[in-house]
Amino acid sequence: MDEFEKAIIYCFDPNVSEDIKQKALAYTESIKVAPEAWLFCLERLGKTQIVLVKFFCLQVFQEIILHRYETLSKTDRLNLRTGLMNWFRLYLVNNQEESAIKNKYAQVMVLLFKQEYLENWLTFFDDFLSMLSPGNSSIDIFLRICKSIDEEVVSFDVHRSPAELAQNTFIKDTMRENAITKIVASWYEILVHHQSPPLINMTLQNIKTYVGWIDISLIVNDKFIPLFCKYLGVRVVRDEVCDCFKEIINKGMDPFAKLTLIQQLEIKNIINFAQLDDQEFNIRVGALINLTGMEILRSLESIQTLQQEGFDKKFQSGEILLEEMLQLLFRFFNNESNDVSYSVYGLASLYVQKLKNIKVLNEKQIQHITLLVQIVRNKMRYKTSRIEEDDDESDIKFADFRKDLSNLFRNIFRICPEMVGSFIATNIQRIVENKNNNNKNKNTTNSKNGTINNNINKTNNNNNNNTNNINNNTNNINNNTTNNNNNNTNKNNVKNANNIKNNNNEDEEDDDDMSFSDIEVSIYLLFQMGEGISATSEETLKSFEKFFGSMVVVLSQSSISITEHQVVSLIYFETIVRYAKYIPMDEQQYLSSVLKSFLDERGIHNKDALVRSKAGYLLNKLAKYLKVQMFPYINDIIDALKNHLIISYEIQKEVPFEEQLNFYESLGFLIGGANLPIEKEALYIEKILNNPIIKMEEIIAKQLYKGDTKENQFYYTVQLTQLINVIGTFSKGFSSFNATNGQLKPDAYCTYKVYFKRSLESIIQLPSLIPSNEDIKSRTFFYMHRMVDVLGKDLKPLLVKILPILLDHATTIDILLEFLVFYNQLISKYKEELFDVINPTLCPIVDRIYKSLNTTIPPVEHSDAERALNDLKKSYFQLIQALFTHNLASTLTSTLNLPLLFQQVFNTVIGGCQASGSHSESIQKVCFVILKKMIDDYSPGGPHAVNGFQSFIYDQVVPLCFQVPLSDQFNMSDFTSTQILLEIGKSLRAIAQKYGDEFLTYMNTILLPKLNVSQEVINQFIKLLQPSSPIKDFQELLKLFIRQKKGLPIKTSNSNINLNNNNNINNNNNNINNNGHTNGNGVNKNGH
């Protein structure tokens, strides 16, 4: 071993010291860059037996060919080529080399091939083919070279320059002319005469990569196809055979040729010949079926398009081919393995999509989708009756597959709603009758907290009647529904649906003669119909309303809900809630059976935590959907929930707090929307709120929160936040404002206020009592937001006391933001009525905002702190905007706040117009809107004219209206910037209206000349600033003027606008006098 070999070994030896390794790396690197490196490495390649040394030498060749090939002389290039071919002939083929060496040699030769083939080495393939021998590694190396040519020349997986793409195309064309026939012949010889599975697999890999761009007849013929079929029966090579068929079918060609090719291949017979004894192989075969079927569908669609354009029909057997693939589709789609089923899902989906475009389905097509519905049902069935929190990979894959199957089912439903409705009705009837028969001797389930009143019990004996009603309603669907795609096939649809057999029942575990998965999937498909119905006609929707209503009644009165299977319970409640609104108004007595299932041990008292939680959540949704229909049952619901409403850790071990919130919200909506007699409403509210209010008052009065520590997990403080939450959440059902017109309700209808006022008295104390707890403050704001709607005008007198308390405790930016949201809500709701409250509080609030913004250390870019500061700036400007929008602009001009207006507000608005950085556009837009409102309000003739405002207009506002859009940061292609420019146009027009000739003279003689604007354009400005001109014309002129100044192309069809394109377009906005300079952050330190 010489120094060279040692150096290479040292480079890869982890046990060598770092010093020696660095010396070795330096030595080998010097060899790589030497001018004669190729010659040195060629000599060493023929002498060494060390794999690392061989690899190094080949790597040197690769780098030279890639990066320094043009530096070699013609003689050096020829010697390099000859040397590599000699090494192949004398050494490589006669020794058992590592795969890494074989692959690296193939890569090097292909790089050399790309450089030399077209001009100097047209015999490349002849040279290698002449050296192929069955007794050595030559065939192996040649196949690797062919594969590497695909990677370097053909494959589109790598980004290539246009020049390289052109060269590669030329190489392929030359290969087609001179070499491909010989290469294909060599593949055939290998497949016929060699029994080595690795060689056969490599040959098949070559074929599948080349078949896409060579003459297809070279492969699809009587020589190759029988060989493929032969090897399809050989387990170790059949995967590659299957992939070859896929690539053959995937080859781009016109639709007639594609169908002829598929017919010639006889895929159906090939697949029937294969031994489908392995799941992985079945997936490959399924992928072949999937691709073949999709290609047939696409080809038939293309042929149909050509026919419409006047082409004669040239191919009659396409439908026969499609039928063959569909039969294979049904077979593989219904396979026990979901992976096999999914391999043909694309074909099933595409076929159904194609059927959606057919107006009238034939009998065969109806049979197809009927069978698909049954297969979808079979494949959707759960293997386990529980949903685990930590799903394994197989569970996640099944959930994803189920989503795809659901989408397929909904599309089938949209094609033939009456057939699917009949199929679902048959399934529901079967599972209901089965469960009812098995449970007829069992006692009806009782509520965990007692029997629900007689209103609910009256309907227990109606199961059989409503089961019989399913068929009646299904018949109504068939009689009344007009199928969007097929008006004449209802009878056939129903007949086919009723004839479907379950193909997989033998694998199920029985549960009282009925698998839980059968029950669950039948209800689940009924649920999915609601997703699909939205895309059908209004007539179809109406015809199904009665059907859905009857399904709800039957399910709720059946024994299905009495189950220990989690997945059945969950889909049962989901489906009930989805369709409960379709229970006919004259059959509302059945709602009692619906409610009963929610309120007893099937629902909110279920032993399964997930079912309990879901039932509570869905009961809340049901209360919002059907609050009017549920009014008669309020007392029963309260009784069923009474233990669940207690706020205590013991109860929350069984009923988490989030679920308790759902119950409070449900009851709030029911009671608040019931229009109950005053005494009855008060009784119900007392039942629900008395305990939380008393508990809150007790904790405050006894100062129990002071004993909280980490050890007791802040027991009482947490309880206080929960109590605020439940009272506030319950209040969502109550409002002092009429929902239809927004007017205040008479006091006689708002007697509930006493309970919320009483709660407010306690809650407003908490920020002062527990000032360090941010959750308490946050929940207090939540409650205050609710009180704006709940108390209405009764809240206003309390705000004088409440607002200072809340502001005092807004010590962090997050809480200050919450305060501003609440403050803006008050302004929006009460408007000018709130003047006496806003006027004294405005200055302290603005001061608090400025102090929070004046951070000594700027926040880290893109951090939460920066986000919070940006949000605070936005909230500040939204506050100023709200004052103008809701007739409270006079608060800024009051004696108390006028200094604030001049010293801070004006300057911050100007700064906001010049804002830069992230999200600055939104701040700029708001600030220009504010400027326009200031001009309207504070200029002469405005409702709140301000002395000295004129100087502000001329010194700052007008220059700003040109400076901002002319700045480099202003992007004319941005939508928000366009909106800002429109606002600027409005402001300038408003100034012209308020200040008249004085302003027009200023523009004519001072501002526009400073911008080097021609007199012609100045005249257009003056003309379009007149109130008599359309404002849109002025906004268009301004936009085009700014574009011209920025050197952007301008174009307008407006005849009133004519900009002189020879005008100086240099950006002279620096000439504009800007006395309102800020630091670009919108709101400046100290308000300047």
UniProtKB/Swiss-Prot annotation:
GO terms for molecular function: small GTPase binding; tRNA binding. Residues 435-513, 1059-1088 are annotated as: Disordered. The keyword Nucleus applies. Transmembrane segments: none annotated. Disulfide bonds: none annotated. The keyword Ion transport does not apply. GO terms for biological process: tRNA export from nucleus; tRNA re-export from nucleus. InterPro entries: ARM-like (IPR011989), ARM-type_fold (IPR016024), Exportin-1/Importin-b-like (IPR013598), Exportin-T_C (IPR045546), XPOT (IPR040017). Keywords: Cytoplasm, Nucleus, RNA-binding, Transport, tRNA-binding. Residues 435-503 have a biased composition (Low complexity). Its main location: nucleus. It is found in: Nucleus; Cytoplasm. GO terms for cellular component: cytoplasm; cytosol; nuclear envelope; nuclear matrix; nuclear pore; nucleus. Belongs to the exportin family. Mediates the nuclear export of aminoacylated tRNAs. This is Exportin-T. It comes from Dictyostelium discoideum (Social amoeba).
